[in-house]
């Protein structure tokens, strides 16, 4: 039906007869001469038709988004009529034949216009997908999936599918449940991850497994979250952290070659505690400096009770400083006020600072500091004339969080971030357990191997866990797993999953661990998030063919939707009014 895609045609084809197919992107009638911009997956090419052409009458019928097949001769555009914005901007096709394969209603959205209301774009997603930019996103997505399969297959991994209808298990989010028609009152759960099945594959001697897995989590959505998503999932037997990290680094190196990036290995590694203390995040963006600096001891003799009391409890509280070089000339009073309002959103009670002037130091903290304390702060933060040093004080978790966010906010405000840089990082030595209102729970998941389970302070127990971070975004992570029944039971006890509950929820896993489970570990990389970063897309919804909204609904199909009484009866379900 066609000889070329639109953007395959160039000056070398001048004089040739070509056949192209696609949609009418724009239609113009200039004094009897008709111009049509034809669009296909590759981009645009201009068709031109004057009254002398036998295709002219048909060309007059064309409107936006009509489906066309066009045949004609390639020629150079006239002098001064070239379009440098188009790949085909130097040529045009003089129409000889034109077929209207299908007409179109007036489109409710402009194809390729990202400023159109997103709900409208999602409702008419099949139109939104027609833009060449969308095609390039899904072309890359397909290429990355193929690279993943080829790379892991070369390393001896087998692609194995795990069940979608599974058992509900606690993994940090709510499960999507599927009622069983056959087993009245019982439910399947859609998998939040293939975690337990891939561990069972290792028990089964599969040695190295992977799949590009569909996962489901019923959780509150954010810009980078979806209720159903895809991850590159893998597991290895007889391995340690270094082995797993090596596979991930090799895989990411091959993947990023697809977009012309050469990334070096090994990636930098940073302990979790260092990441939190120095950057206020377990996924720090290292494309710029601005470290957080501990200055608690400088406030021990401060006359400000809030700061001095905080300084006396270094286990649970923190005083962090952030020196922003040259900020005094760049940050007006209104900007400082905006930054204070920003950190208040995350639990700060205010934002103290010191402005380093030529002949004095200004700021609300100056009068509360001793001469020695002030001197130590200036030395430790390397504060020079023109700098502003910001301070956060209070509960450790809250301070690290809002000061880490302030660090990012300042970097964005001052344009300190190299948008083209790729800064990969491993964050390691995560805490095994986290405190909640109801005791402790597993920070990653309860199948992670702890490093020092006998430690008296449960909050100091570390996990054989690791996250891979790119430019401040968690790409994925993994861990070495527990492969002995006794250790698995011990971890369950630490998080108040006692024997009876453990058997009910995880009896099949505990049983499997009795039969010679090998040491094993693995990883998962968020596939959608990876493609979002590689394409510099604004939202994860841009890289999923038919995404859900932030309210977990599909505007295209109106899912979820009610079901009729007969279906409910078959499933033994009665709805409460």
UniProtKB/Swiss-Prot annotation:
Gene source species: Helicobacter pylori (strain ATCC 700392 / 26695)
Listed EC numbers: 6.1.1.23
One Pfam family this sequence matches: GAD
Organism domain of life: Bacteria
Chain segments carrying region Aspartate: 195-198
Positions contributing to ATP binding: 217-219, 226, 474, 526-529
Reported function: Aspartyl-tRNA synthetase with relaxed tRNA specificity since it is able to aspartylate not only its cognate tRNA(Asp) but also tRNA(Asn). Is 1.7 times more efficient at aminoacylating tRNA(Asp) over tRNA(Asn). Reaction proceeds in two steps: L-aspartate is first activated by ATP to form Asp-AMP and then transferred to the acceptor end of tRNA(Asp/Asn).
GO annotation, biological process: aspartyl-tRNA aminoacylation
Annotated phenotype, changing residue 81 to N: Enhances enzyme specificity for tRNA(Asp) over tRNA(Asn), by reducing enzyme's ability to misacylate tRNA(Asn)
Residues annotated as site: Important for tRNA non-discrimination: 30, 80
Quaternary structure, from the entry: Homodimer.
Subcellular location: Cytoplasm
This protein's name: Aspartate--tRNA(Asp/Asn) ligase
HAMAP family the record matches: Asp_tRNA_synth_type1 (MF_00044)
Family of this protein: Belongs to the class-II aminoacyl-tRNA synthetase family. Type 1 subfamily.
GO CC field: cytoplasm
Catalytic activity: tRNA(Asx) + L-aspartate + ATP = L-aspartyl-tRNA(Asx) + AMP + diphosphate
Gene3D superfamilies the UniProt entry points to: Bira Bifunctional Protein, Domain 2, GAD-like domain, Nucleic acid-binding proteins
